[in-house]
Amino acid sequence: MAWIENDEGDVLLVRQTAGRKLWTLPGGKVKRSESLQRALKREIQEETGLRVAAVRYRQMYDRPKRGAITVLFAVSVKRNPTRTYFPTQEIADLGFFDRLPTNATPSAKFFWKAEYPGKHLNPPG
């Protein structure tokens, strides 16, 4: 998963078209014989149209009950992230958030709390 901030420090989240349509950090599955960083770059390009400039490991979220490990990378992109976006087959919407929406994935909640312990977890009321 990618932690991408804009100039204001807001974090990029995507809302998927399939499943429960929850907000999450950009990212996806690693293909056979693909490195973690290559998979991350491919997924970010596919989901957001942004091109990755640099990737730095941040932390890991182990989910043994699901048999999954999710890895978080801090990502900088080749151009400043903007709010201009066109939906894709996988992604219904995206946006930069200063608060984590209540309808977010467990992994997004885990990483948000770890990366932004002082930031709000819910939209303003």
Locate predicted features.
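Conserved N-terminal beta-strand and adjoining loop/helix that marks the start
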Residues: M1-V11
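Conserved positions in beta-strands of structured domains
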Residues: E5, R58-Q59
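A short beta-turn/loop motif at secondary-structure boundaries
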Residues: T17, Y61-K65, T88-Q89
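Nudix hydrolase/Nudix homology domain
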Residues: R20-W23, T88-G125
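The catalytic Nudix box helix
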Residues: L25-Y57
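Active-site-adjacent beta-strand/loop module that shapes the phosphate/pyrophosphate-binding cleft
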Residues: Y61-R83, G95-R99, K109-Y116
